């Protein structure tokens, strides 16, 4: 259940904690008497929690990662929801970097779609408010096979992105053409991409619950996630490390994106919704920042920046974040998921996000932040 791993430069050291090991940070935090954590831990089996907390230390030119895990297991399935938008954004930037005629500022639209956008705007919308349509446009540009291959080639695995989000024909294996505006008078049309058929996943917990809603009708029996996206904690953490600290990895594990593209991505990851024009009353600072601040709508302190991507759907909340405090000179990573579906019925939009899930993740972030302040 409890595991600790250290990554020093390019060397990985792994060791499991024994009963005689002093209490590790996650063990201490998850033993908290705060009801936001305690109530979840008292019903642990219900919530399918997985957590990876990464301490970050610097030694000369080396970045040292020390990972602490709680119940992290690639074979135990959880639905990743919108966290899959992070790899889509990275893969899209890498593909753009290889095409001389395109950039993040290139206007385009998907054939059959009335919205004209740019790649940069789509990426900003993905991180600021977790826009599903923006993600789907990037997936039409990439195709599922190309996205998955790019991740796997850089060591971000296991991963299986199979479908779009919240749209008709989400699992269509053929992408739609994109129309690009290359200058004021020239347009270019991309060709549809035919992707591999989706194969069912064979993982623990791939069928969940006692019933589900389909076509507005209740269906008895577990909900089958075997054809859904798969993006476990280990892969999420691996991608975050490679984007925040590319220098800690060999060249073949770094994404081929330009410095300008990476700067744009990092800015998008920590930008607050109001900073790019969204109504701050509806899209408050912590709208998509679950750790530390997710359980309140107050403005976030300016000295704390959270580079992250959240996901929430089917009762599953996930956040993958790099948290930086510029005033106190601390930094750490945290990736966690929790299931909050008390009635065990899926797709009914009756989940305990606000009552249990977000408060748990917020308090988890706060307690680990306090540990970072003291170490």
Q: What are the residue ranges of the model-derived segments?
A:
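Short, well-structured active-site flanking segments
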Residues: 94-121
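C-terminal motif of bacterial Sec signal peptides marking the signal peptidase cleavage site
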Residues: 13-16
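Residue-level preference for non-acidic, small/hydrophobic
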Residues: 85-92, 126, 151, 236, ...
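Sec-dependent signal peptide recognition
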Residues: 2-8
């Amino acid at each position: 259940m409890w595991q600790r791993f250290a990554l020093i430069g390019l060397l990985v050291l792994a060791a499991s904690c024994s009963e005689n090991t002093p209490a590790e940070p996650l063990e201490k935090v998850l033993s908290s008497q705060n009801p936001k954590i305690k109530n979840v831990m008292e019903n642990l089996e219900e919530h399918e929690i997985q957590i990876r907390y990464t301490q970050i230390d610097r030694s000369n030119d080396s970045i040292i990662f020390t990972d602490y895990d709680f119940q992290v297991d690639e074979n135990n399935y959880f639905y990743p929801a919108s966290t899959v938008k992070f790899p889509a954004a990275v893969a899209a930037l890498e593909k753009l970097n290889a095409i001389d005629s395109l950039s993040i500022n290139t206007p385009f639209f998907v054939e059959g779609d009335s919205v004209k956008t740019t790649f940069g705007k789509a990426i900003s919308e993905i991180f600021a408010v977790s826009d599903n349509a923006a993600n789907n446009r990037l997936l039409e540009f990439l195709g599922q096979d190309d996205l998955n291959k790019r991740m796997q080639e850089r060591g971000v695995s296991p991963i299986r992105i199979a479908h779009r989000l919240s749209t008709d024909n989400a699992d269509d294996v053929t992408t739609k053409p994109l129309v690009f505006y290359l200058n004021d008078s020239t347009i270019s049309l991309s060709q549809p991409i035919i992707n591999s058929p989706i194969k069912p996943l064979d993982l623990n917990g791939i069928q969940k619950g006692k019933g589900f809603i389909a076509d507005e009708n209740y269906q008895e029996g577990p909900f089958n996630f075997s054809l859904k996206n798969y993006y476990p904690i280990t892969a999420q953490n691996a991608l975050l490390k490679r984007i925040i600290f590319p220098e800690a990895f060999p060249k073949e594990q770094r994404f081929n994106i330009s410095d300008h593209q990476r700067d744009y991505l990092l800015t998008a990851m920590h930008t607050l919704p109001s900073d790019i024009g969204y109504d701050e009353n509806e899209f408050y600072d912590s709208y998509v920042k679950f750790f530390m601040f997710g359980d309140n709508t107050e403005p976030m302190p300016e000295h704390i920046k959270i580079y992250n991507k959240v996901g929430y759907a089917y009762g599953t909340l996930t956040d993958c974040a790099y948290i930086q405090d510029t005033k106190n000179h601390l930094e750490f990573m945290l990736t966690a998921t929790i299931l909050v579906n008390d009635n065990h019925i899926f797709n009914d939009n009756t989940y305990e996000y606000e009552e249990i899930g977000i408060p748990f993740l917020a308090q988890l972030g706060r307690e680990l932040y306090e540990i970072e302040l003291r170490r």
